[in-house]
Amino acid sequence: MENLMKLRMLSFALTAAAVVCACSVRQGRAQAPTLVLAVAEIHYVDTSGEVIDQSADHRRRLREFEAALRSDLVASGKIANAALECSPNACSVGDIHDGQLLDKAKEAGATHLLIGRFHKMSTLIQQAKFDVIDVKARKVVFDRYISFRGDNDAAWRRAESFLARQILDHGEW
């Protein structure tokens, strides 16, 4: 009888400890800081030499790429969005200096800033460089070079999805 009582007390103590630990873990997760990312407009350079002027299509695809990237990252629940205060088509690394973009990101409440550059090299090949910069430390914490074939909406969507997965899988900020 005495052993049974000790066993019940031990069982109760272990259950209470498990509940306390589980609550602590949940609180720790809830308090984890959310990455607040400002996505600057992406700079675009076309040196393909194509006869047809596709600049309007490229601007449209860039804005769609940026919007989809923001949406995919926010939908993950891991990243919040901060909007940069800039005039339209004047907020990329081709328009203003990185330092100015970082200042705008800080003003917007961002912890991190994503900057990017696309380069269309030929009718079929495009490459891009993306950096995520820690706003406070002013240090690159993520960088990717990507290349893709095609200059149509589907190719751009695949590139955006790939980049979003790369950012979300990075893990260390």
Which residues are covered by each model-predicted region?
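Bacterial N-terminal signal peptides
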Residues: 11-22
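C-terminal/domain-edge helix-coil "capping" segments
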Residues: 30-47, 72-79, 102-107, 119-127, ...
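Short acidic, glycine/proline-rich loop/turn micro-motifs
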Residues: 48-54
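N-terminal, post-signal-peptide region of Sec/Tat-exported proteins
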Residues: 55-87
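Soluble non-cytosolic domains of exported or imported proteins
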Residues: 56-67, 95, 150-158
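Short, solvent-exposed, polar/charged sequence segments at loop or secondary-structure edges
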Residues: 75-115
